A protein has these predicted regions:
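Function-determining surface determinants
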Residues: 1-497
Length: 497
C-alpha cells in the first residue's frame, strides 16, 4: 500500500486517573507491547521550521531509524507527512537530509515556504523520549491506530540546563477509510474517559520549552484566502478557520493557563465566527443539530460572564480610578472559576466533534458544485440593507434594537473576512476599516449597557457605586453619539462586494 501523503489524527488528553483504563482498552485491542520512541527534533538556530508550521525529526523506533517531515495545513487535525527509513544501526543519531523529502508533497510545501533552507542550517533543538502502546483497530469504513503515549520532552536551556515536560496523551489516527470513523471513536473516549481534544503537537510543546515560551500566543482571526470558488473549497476553508481558532485557543487554556484572558477572548471570537459561518452554510442546507445549537448557545453564554467582568476589571475600574472615584467593590474575573472545566466538559467536547463531522460530511456532499458564491453575495446584500434601515433611526430605537444591529454588523464583518476574495480589491480595505470603527463603537456601547445592568444591584450595598453609575451613564450618552456618527460614515461608503 502506498504511503499516505496526508495525516489525519485526533489527539486527546484525559485525567491522569483514566490512564490505566485507556491502557487496558488498548491491550484488549491487541496493544500488548510498548515501544520506546526516541526522537530528535531538528531546526535552525532561530527555529525557522517551527515558526513556519513545520516539524522535522529523526526517530529511533525499536531498532530502526525513521526520518519524518510534517507540514501544517489549514486544518488543525491534518498535516502533510513523509516518512523515510534510514539505514543506520546503533544508538547514535544518524545523518539527516532534507533532500530525501524534495519530491514528496510535504517536501514541496517546505521548499515553497523556505526555498533557501539547507540541511547544513539545521541542528538538534529538542528531543522526546516516549513509550507508546499502539493498537490497530478495524472499524466499519476505516482502519485506525490508537497510540497511547507517555514520556517526556527535553530541551536544553541557554545556560546548559535541561528542561523537561511530561507527555501523557492518546492519538487516534486514520490509516485508511472514512475520517468520520475517527470522530466516532473519539466520541466514545470522551464519554467513557472524560477525554478532551488537544491540538498541541509534541513539536510545538518542544519548541515552547526550548525557547522558554510558557504558552503559545492566542490564535487570532484574519481574512481568508480561497484558492477557488467551488462549494467544497468555500465550506471547508471557512468552517476549518472557525473551528481551528476555537480548538487551538481552547487547548492553550486547558494547559493550566493562568493568564487566559486573551485566549478566552479569541476562543469566543472563534465561536462567534462559527455562528456567522453556519448562517451562511444554511444557504447550502448545512445546519447544526438542535443539541449542538443548544450546547453552543449555553457555552457561549457562560464564556460571556468572563468577558463582561473583564470590562469591569480592565476598562471600568481604571477609568474610575483616573476620574478619582471613591473606593468600591465590583465583581471581578478573579471571582470566577478557571474556564478549563467548562471547556473540557463532555457537552462542549462533543460539540467540537460534531462541528468537525459537519465539515467532513459537507466536503463529501458538495464535490464539483458551484452554487454557493451567488447565494453569499445575495446574503451580504440583505445584511447590508437590513442594518442600514436600523442605522437610519439609530438615535430613536431601543437598546435591544441597537444590540441586534451590533450583532448583525459583527456578522457582516466576519463574513467579509471569510469572503474577501469575493470583494472588490480596491474598496475592501477602506470598507472593512469603517465597519471595524462602527463595530468598536457599538461594542463599547454594549459593554457600558451590560456594566450598568451588573452594578445596579450593588448600589444599595455600596453608596460609592453611585459614582460608577453616574460615570457610566455619561459615557453611555457620549458613545451613543459616537456610534451614530460612525454609522453615518460607514453607510455613506460604497459596498465592498
Amino acid at each position: 500500500m502506498a504511503e499516505k501523503t496526508q495525516e489525519f489524527e485526533l489527539k486527546l488528553l484525559f485525567p491522569q486517573e483514566k490512564f490505566k483504563g485507556i491502557e487496558q482498552f488498548l491491550i484488549s485491542k491487541g496493544g500488548l507491547r510498548r515501544q520506546r520512541l526516541q526522537a530528535a527534533y531538528i531546526d535552525t538556530d532561530d527555529f525557522l521550521l517551527a515558526r513556519s508550521g513545520i516539524a522535522f525529526r529523526v526517530r529511533k523506533e525499536g531498532r530502526f531509524w525513521v526520518q519524518t517531515l510534517k507540514v501544517a495545513t489549514g486544518h488543525s487535525l491534518e498535516r502533510l507527512e513523509h516518512n523515510v527509513p534510514l539505514i543506520h544501526s546503533g544508538a547514535n543519531l544518524p545523518q539527516w537530509s532534507l533532500e530525501s523529502h524534495r519530491d514528496h508533497e510535504a517536501g514541496k510545501a517546505l521548499y515553497r515556504l523556505l526555498p533557501k533552507l539547507k540541511t547544513t542550517d539545521l541542528r538538534v533543538r529538542y528531543k522526546t523520549d516516549i513509550y507508546r502502546r499502539a493498537a490497530q483497530v478495524k472499524a466499519r469504513g476505516a482502519v485506525l491506530e490508537y497510540a497511547l503515549d507517555s514520556g517526556v520532552i527535553k530541551a536544553l536551556h541557554n545556560d546548559g540546563s535541561e528542561l523537561t515536560v511530561d507527555v501523557s496523551e492518546l492519538e487516534i489516527e486514520l490509516l485508511s477509510g472514512d475520517k468520520s470513523v475517527v470522530l466516532a471513536h473519539a466520541k466514545n473516549m470522551i464519554k467513557k474517559y472524560k477525554a478532551y481534544i488537544d491540538t498541541r503537537s509534541k513539536a510545538q510543546r518542544g519548541f515552547n520549552l526550548a525557547t522558554g515560551i510558557q504558552v503559545s500566543p492566542p490564535l487570532k482571526t484574519k481574512a481568508l484566502k480561497l484558492s477557488t470558488f467551488d462549494d467544497v473549497t468555500i465550506i471547508s476553508t471557512v468552517l476549518h478557520s472557525c473551528i481551528n481558532q476555537a480548538l487551538i485557543n481552547a487547548s492553550e487554556i486547558n494547559a493550566n493557563l493562568a493568564n487566559f484572558d486573551e485566549h478566552l477572548h479569541q476562543l469566543r471570537v472563534g465561536l462567534r465566527r462559527l455562528k456567522t459561518a453556519m448562517k451562511f452554510m444554511a444557504l447550502r442546507h448545512i445546519f447544526f443539530a438542535e443539541v449542538d445549537l443548544n450546547t453552543l448557545d449555553n457555552f457561549f453564554a457562560k464564556l460571556g460572564a468572563y468577558r463582561d467582568l473583564n470590562f469591569l476589571d480592565e476598562k471600568l475600574l481604571p477609568a474610575l480610578l483616573a476620574a478619582k472615584a471613591p473606593p468600591m467593590k465590583l465583581a471581578s474575573v478573579a471571582d470566577l472559576p478557571h474556564p478549563d472545566a467548562l471547556i473540557k466538559s463532555q457537552d462542549v467536547q462533543l460539540f467540537f466533534i460534531s462541528v468537525l463531522g459537519i465539515i467532513i460530511e459537507a466536503e463529501k456532499n458538495n464535490v464539483n458544485l458551484k452554487y454557493f458564491k451567488p447565494l453569499i453575495l445575495k446574503e451580504l446584500d440583505k445584511i447590508h440593507k437590513d442594518t442600514k434601515k436600523t442605522a437610519n433611526t439609530f438615535m430613536m430605537v431601543s437598546d435591544d434594537e441597537r444590540h441586534r444591529l451590533r450583532k448583525k454588523l459583527k456578522r457582516l464583518r466576519y463574513a467579509l473576512e471569510f469572503f474577501k476574495d469575493l470583494c472588490h480589491a480596491g474598496r475592501y480595505k477602506e470598507f472593512l476599516k469603517k465597519l471595524e470603527g462602527v463595530s468598536d463603537a457599538l461594542g463599547q456601547y454594549n459593554d457600558i449597557c451590560v456594566a450598568l445592568e451588573k452594578i445596579q444591584s450593588l448600589v444599595e450595598q455600596d453608596r460609592n457605586v453611585f459614582f460608577a453609575q453616574g460615570w457610566l451613564k455619561a459615557e453611555q450618552a457620549r458613545v451613543l453619539v459616537l456610534s451614530n456618527k460612525e454609522l453615518k460614515t460607514f453607510y455613506a461608503d460604497k459596498k465592498a462586494w
